[in-house]
Amino acid sequence: PVGVAWALREAGFNAVQGFDAAFSSCVPLGSGLSSSAAMTCSTALALDDVYGLGYGASDAGRVTLINAAIKSENDMAGASTGGLDQNASMRCTFGHALRLDCRPELSPLENVSQQEFDLDKYGLELLVLDTQAPHQLNDGQYAQRRATCEKAAEILGVANLRVVADSIAKSDDPFQALKETLDKLEDDTMKKRVRHVITEIARVNSFVRAFANGKIDEAGRLFNASHDSLSADYEVTVPELDTAVAVARANG
C-alpha cells in the first residue's frame, strides 16, 4: 500500500501524504486470484477518495490510478506485472468480460472493451477455485516468460508477438504460417512460448465471437484449449490446478 502512495506522489500528486490503513479481504493470498492487485487498487481508490484527487469515478481517471498500482508492484515490491490484474480489478463491469488489448500503440481508453458475459442465460455458473497452490509474482517466472517472448520478437524482426499473431491470422493457411514462424526459432522452449502467445490471441478472438453468437460449446472448447496451452507450452500451471481442471472436465 505504501508503494501506491509513493507512485502517486511520483506522478505529481503531492497532496497524498502519510496514512494509517487496515485491510480485510476475502481474496486468498498467493492463489493466483489477483490478491495483490486487489490490495493496490483498493489502496489507490481509497487515497483518491481521502485526498480528493477525483480520478476514481471515471474509467479515464481510473487508468491513472491503475498506473500507480502497477508502478508500486513493479518498482517497489519487485513483483513484475503487465497490468492485466489491475485493469480487471478497476475496469470490469457487472455481467461483462473485459477484453484487454495490450498493444503499446493503443491509448488506455482504446485498449479495453466490455463483452457481454451473461452465463445465467445459458444455465451456467463461473466457478472460481482456490487450489491451495502457492503463487508469487516476485519469483521471476513472469519476467522470464516476458523476456523470452521479447527475445523471440527481436529474432523475428517485429516489435512484439502481436504483430506476428495478426499476420498469421490473416494468412491463407494459419497453421502453415505458424509452423514457418516457429521454424525460424532455434530454442525449443522459445518455440513453445511463442506458440502459446500466438494461439492464445487467436483463441481470445474466437471466444468473443463464439460467446456473442451463443456457441457455448465452442466457447468451452476454447477454454479447455487455453488451459492445455498454458500447461504444455507456457508451462505456468501446477499439478493442483491441472487436477482441478481434470476433475471439472470429468464431471461435465
What are these language model-derived features?
Residues 1-118, 245-252:
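Gly/Ser-rich oxyanion-binding loop with an adjacent helix/lid
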Residues 99-252:
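C-terminal nucleotide
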